[in-house]
């Protein structure tokens, strides 16, 4: 306990940036764009006060990770503008968000994402995941970390009913309306392709409820 007391407090900018980024991420997942935009402005302003482009790059990756978890996939252009100044862990994280991790990237990533990164980097070709593989690669960490791992695996071409259900369940349990709608829409398309009319109808009823 005495040792904890000797640690210097985090500077105000860092505390403010982290809090605003968390609020922005939650607002995005819940489908509250006005709050999301305001909080990202606060987070970016706090980081900008340091004049450090490497930290600004890290902040943009946090935003992009939330979008990836909600199945909004692009190349994270706001990070790309700062990419030359990003540190090695952030470079690896950006590749991971694009489902293109290199063989040595896993050790640079948050531990919750390492299993998925190793799987993607090692596989010769994309393949549906079994229930056990889904649990192994999406079962660690906080709900957003788990949803992100599922989304990156999906982006890498590892779609399976078990993976889609994991994404749906994670988003539903947190009440993340926007993320849940994205996962349900994909699950509905999969059910329709398989000719499972009952499943597709059930999913569409869930989507109708979300839109109320």
Where are these regions (language model features)?
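TPR repeat positional signature
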Residues: 20, 39, 55-56, 60, ...
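Short, charge-rich amphipathic alpha-helical segments embedded
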Residues: 43-73, 173-182, 192, 211
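Residues that mark the junctions of alpha-helical repeat units in TPR/alpha-solenoid scaffolds
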Residues: 9, 16, 35, 56, ...
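Bacterial Sec signal peptide processing site at the extreme N-terminus
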Residues: 1-23
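Extended amphipathic alpha-helical interaction segments
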Residues: 89-176
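Hydrophobic/aromatic side-chain positions at a characteristic register within alpha-helices
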Residues: 9, 21, 28-31, 48, ...
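Structural register within alpha-helical repeat arrays
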Residues: 23-24, 43, 63, 148-153, ...
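Alpha-helical linker/edge segments of TPR/alpha-solenoid repeat scaffolds
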Residues: 63-87, 100-109, 192-200
């Amino acid at each position: 306990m005495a040792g904890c007391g000797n640690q210097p407090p985090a500077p105000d900018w860092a505390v403010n940036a982290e809090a605003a980024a968390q609020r922005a991420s939650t607002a995005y997942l819940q489908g509250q764009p006005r709050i999301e935009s305001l909080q990202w402005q606060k987070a970016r302003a706090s980081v900008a006060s340091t004049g450090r482009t490497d930290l600004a790059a890290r902040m943009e990756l946090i935003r992009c990770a939330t979008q990836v978890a909600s199945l909004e996939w692009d190349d994270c252009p706001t990070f790309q503008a700062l990419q030359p100044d990003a540190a090695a862990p952030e470079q690896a994280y950006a590749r991971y968000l694009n489902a293109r991790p290199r063989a040595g990237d896993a050790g640079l990533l948050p531990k919750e994402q390492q299993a998925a990164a190793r799987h993607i980097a090692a596989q010769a070709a994309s393949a549906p995941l079994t229930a056990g593989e889904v649990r192994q690669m999406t079962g660690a960490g906080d709900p957003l970390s788990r949803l992100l791992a599922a989304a990156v695996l999906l982006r890498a071409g590892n779609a399976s009913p078990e993976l889609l259900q994991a994404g749906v369940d994670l988003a539903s349990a947190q009440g993340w309306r926007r993320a849940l709608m994205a996962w349900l829409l994909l699950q509905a398309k999969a059910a329709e392709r398989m000719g499972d009319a009952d499943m597709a109808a059930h999913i569409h009823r869930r989507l109708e409820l979300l839109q109320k």
